[in-house]
């Protein structure tokens, strides 16, 4: 699974389609990621969000908004808050850690999903600091791709439900065209993350991971 989803560096041109139950809005952005400690995102649309930037370095995240012309540090428990009204937290959006390095797993059995036989696995976090202490995933055993994921708190409360859809081949990997997130602490909401373009193992200029990029 890691072989399909993870890379040393990654570039994404994508959209977040946020449905809060009353209206739908779309955010367009470009993101660059290096390992699990560095990522930078630039928001292109809509007009009111254009120029918004997010920079993650280790466990700290800075957000720059052009209408205030200042940057805000988001750290600690604030990383778990909803990002720009979506079903993703800031942590969800910026996290890119290998499953095998963050969790230990066991196979619970088989289950049919959408006419396909899947393996059901339970994953336990190796570190107490992980937001999601347990994951339950449904995996295509032949293609080794995740089809569905449930993310739980330490208490056992279901926090997030994620569906992985429309896998396609990208650089000898299978990667979903879209992921559908549902924050289970909200009602009647969902956020679809569309990957319009994704490139793996790309060269990323060092300036993208410097606070100096958080300027107008």
Specify the residue positions occupied by each region the protein language model found.
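Short, surface-exposed linear segments at secondary-structure transitions and domain or protein termini
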Residues: 34-41, 81-90, 169-173, 198-207
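N-terminal mature ectodomain segment of secretory-pathway/periplasmic proteins
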Residues: 1-67
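Solvent-exposed coil/turn segments that connect beta secondary-structure elements
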Residues: 17, 34-36, 44-46, 59-60, ...
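Gly/Pro-enriched, hydrophobic low-complexity segments
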Residues: 70-73, 94, 114-211
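Short, conserved active-site entrance elements at the starts or edges of catalytic domains
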Residues: 86-124
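Acidic/charged, solvent-exposed loop-and-adjacent secondary-structure segments enriched in E/D, K/R, S/T
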Residues: 65-95
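Short structured motifs
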Residues: 12, 26-27, 103-109, 162-165, ...
């Amino acid at each position: 699974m890691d072989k399909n989803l993870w890379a040393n560096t990654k570039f994404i041109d994508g959209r977040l389609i946020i449905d809060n139950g009353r209206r739908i809005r779309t955010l367009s952005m470009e993101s660059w990621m290096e390992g699990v400690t560095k990522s930078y995102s630039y928001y292109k649309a809509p007009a009111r969000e254009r120029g918004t930037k997010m920079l993650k370095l280790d466990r700290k995240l800075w957000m720059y908004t052009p209408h205030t012309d200042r940057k805000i540090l988001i750290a600690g428990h604030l990383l778990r808050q909803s990002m720009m009204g979506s079903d993703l937290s800031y942590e969800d959006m910026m996290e890119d850690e290998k499953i095998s390095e963050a969790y230990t797993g066991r196979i619970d059995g088989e289950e049919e999903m959408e006419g396909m036989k899947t393996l059901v696995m339970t994953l336990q976090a190796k570190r107490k600091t992980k937001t999601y202490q347990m994951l339950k995933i449904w995996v295509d055993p032949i293609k080794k791709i995740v089809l569905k994921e449930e993310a739980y708190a330490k208490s056992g409360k279901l926090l997030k439900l994620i569906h992985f859809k429309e896998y396609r081949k990208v650089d000898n990997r299978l990667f979903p065209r879209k992921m559908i997130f549902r924050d289970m602490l909200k009602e009647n909401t969902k956020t679809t993350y569309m990957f319009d373009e994704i490139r793996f193992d790309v060269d990323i200029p060092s300036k993208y991971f410097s606070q100096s990029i958080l300027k107008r």
